[in-house]
Curated annotation (Swiss-Prot):
Stretches the record annotates as Disordered: 1-20, 52-97
Pfam families named in the record: Rnk_N
InterPro entries found in the cross-reference section: Rnk_N
Protein name, as recorded: Uncharacterized protein in napC 3'region
Amino acid sequence: MTEGADMARTSRPPVTIASDTLDRLERLAEGAMARNPDLADRLLTELGPRPVPAARADARGCSPASERGHLSRTRPPGASRTVVLVLPEDADIGRRA
């Protein structure tokens, strides 16, 4: 396997998230630290990149639609995939999208 292929397999594109959603996600991760430190640390690592100000996030389509935020990962080469983030208090695990 080539080095480039190996990097593509292990590296993930950056997450774009609105700054007004960041506080809620950080509190969620900090609250989970005692119960599941590995998962909480992974979430905090994902949140590490600088947040996008809410005004810019709206233009980029990564601002919360209501109580839900949208995470957008830019995938090389320029393709994009949007993931809808549902916070635990809004989750209905019995319902499929």
